[in-house]
Amino acid sequence: MTEELDLWRLAAGLGLFLFGMHQLEQALTQLAGRSFKKFLRQYTAKPVRGVIAGALSTAALQSSSVVSLIVLAFVGTGIVSLASALGIVFGSNLGTTMTGWIVATIGFKLDIEALALPLITLGGFGVVWSAAGTRRSGVSHFVVGLGLMLMGLEFMKSGALIATELFDPAALAGYPLIAFLVAGLLLTAVIQSSSATIMITLSALYAGAIPLEAAAATAIGADLGTTITAVLGALAGSAAKKRVAAAVVLFNVVADTIAFVSLKPLIHFITKIIGLADPLFALVAFHSLFNLIGILIFLPTIPLLSRWLDRRFREDETPLLRHIKPGDTAVPEAALENMTRETWRLIDQAVALN
C-alpha cells in the first residue's frame, strides 16, 4: 500500500507540474502578445540571431512548442526564412535547459512548499477576480502556474526520497546507460514534455536513486523523445512543417548521439575540470553543454541544410490559395499577413486577365 501511495505521489507531482507548465505557457503567451512575435520577426534576419532569439524566447516562455508553433506559421507566410527558422528552433533546444537551471538553483535548496502555497493562493484569487483576457488575468495565471509547478516538483522530490527507502539504488548500477536513454525517450514521448522528464530525473538524482551518468543518459533520451512529437505533428502537415520537423530530428539525433558517445568525458570535464561537484548542477550543465555543441556543429550548415530541405520537401500540388494556410489562425499576425498577400495576388491576376 505504501508503494502505491508513493507512486501516486510521484504521478500527482508530475500532473501538477505539467498543468502548472501549461498555465505558465498560456499566461506568458498572452502577456508577451504582439511584442514577442514582433521580436521574432525583426531579430531573426540571420541564423546566428535566430539561435539567440530562439534561446531567449524559449527561456522566457518556458515552452519550445509555443515558439515552434509561431515559427512554423511565420515560415508558412514567408515572414521568416527557413534558414532563420532553423536557427530559432536550434536555439530553442538550448532555451529549454533554462528550466533545469532554475529548478536546480532554487527547487532543491529552498522550502518549495512554503513558496508554492502563497503563489497558488494569490494566483487563484487573482484568476477568479480578474476578467478573462486582461493583463491582470494573465499575471494571475502566471503566478498560479508557477505555484503549481513548484508544488508538483515538491511532490516528485518527496515521492522520490520515500521511494529510495523501498529499494536499494545500487541495484540500478547493473543496467547499461542505453537503458536509461530509452527510458527517458519513452517517458518524454508519453508525457509530451522533455522538461517534465528532466524534473523527474533531477528528483531521482537528488534522492540518490540514480547515479549522475544514468541521469545524463536519461536527459539525452528526453531530448530524443521530443523528436517523436515533431515527427507525429508533421506527418500530415505542410511542406514547411515537414522541413522544420526534419531539421529538429536531424539536430537532436546528431547532438544526442555525440552526447551519448562522449558522455563520460563530458561528465568528467564538468565535474573535475570545471569543478561542478553538485550532481544537480552537473546534470543541467551537461544538458546545456551538449545542446550548445549541437548548435555549434549545425550553425555553419544552416544555409546548406535549408536549401536541401527545400528540395527534399516540396508542395505536392499548387493550391488554389497560395498564401493562406489552414493553421494560420493560431498566429493572428501571420493570418493577417497571409490575407494581405493573397488579396494582392488575386488583384494582380484579375488585372492580368483584363
Per-region residue spans from a language model:
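Non-transmembrane accessory domains of multi-pass membrane transporters/channels
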Residues: 302-354
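Helix-loop-helix hairpins and the membrane-proximal interhelical loops
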Residues: 1-47, 139-186, 204
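Transmembrane helix-loop junctions at the membrane interface of multipass transporters and ion channels
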Residues: 97, 101-111, 129-130, 161, ...
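Membrane-interfacial helix-loop connectors
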Residues: 67-93, 100-120, 188-226, 233-241, ...
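Core mid-bundle transmembrane helix pairs that form the ion/substrate translocation pathway
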Residues: 111-113, 121-184, 250-254, 283-295
